[in-house]
Structures are given as structure tokens and as C-alpha cells.
């Protein structure tokens, strides 16, 4: 629901699109590949 989710990917605030679309951009912002790679 936060604009920051989509803002990191498309460059403009995305409210529902970022979450509903699930393009993965929102996930990358919240969970960058660095920590994921280390934990895995």
C-alpha cells in the first residue's frame, strides 16, 4: 500500500498496481537479492 514499493521500480508511486501486479519489483525493494542470497 506504500508508494515506496513501486517507486523503486517504475520511478513513480504505485499503490495497488505494484502489489496486485506482483511484477516482483515491490519484492526486490522490500527484500533485496543481497540478504536473500546470504540467508539462502
From Swiss-Prot:
Record GO biological process: regulation of blood pressure; vasodilation
Q: Which family does it belong to?
A: Belongs to the natriuretic peptide family.
Q: Sorted alphabetically, which InterPro entries does this protein's record hold?
A: Natr_peptide (IPR000663), Natr_peptide_CS (IPR030480), Natriuretic_peptide_brain (IPR002408)
One MF term in the entry's GO annotations: hormone activity
Disulphide connectivity of cysteines: 9-25
* Protein origin, superkingdom: Eukaryota
Please verify whether the record's keywords include Secreted.
Answer: yes
User: Under the cellular component aspect of Gene Ontology, which terms does the record hold?
Assistant: extracellular region
Q: Please name the SMART domains in this protein's record.
A: NAT_PEP (SM00183)
Species for this entry: Pseudechis australis (Mulga snake)
Subcellular localization, per the record?
Secreted
The free-text function statement in the UniProt record for this protein reads: Snake venom natriuretic peptide that targets both NPR1 and NPR2. Exhibits hypotensive and vasodepressor activities.
Q: Which UniProt keywords apply?
A: Disulfide bond, Hypotensive agent, Secreted, Toxin, Vasoactive, Vasodilator
Protein name in the entry: Natriuretic peptide PaNP-a
Asked if the record carries the keyword Disulfide bond, the reply is yes
Tissue-by-tissue expression = Expressed by the venom gland.
Amino acid at each position: 500500500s506504500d508508494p515506496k514499493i513501486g517507486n523503486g521500480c517504475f520511478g513513480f508511486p504505485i499503490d495497488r498496481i505494484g502489489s496486485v501486479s506482483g511484477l516482483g519489483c515491490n519484492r526486490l525493494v522490500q527484500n533485496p537479492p543481497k540478504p536473500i542470497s546470504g540467508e539462502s
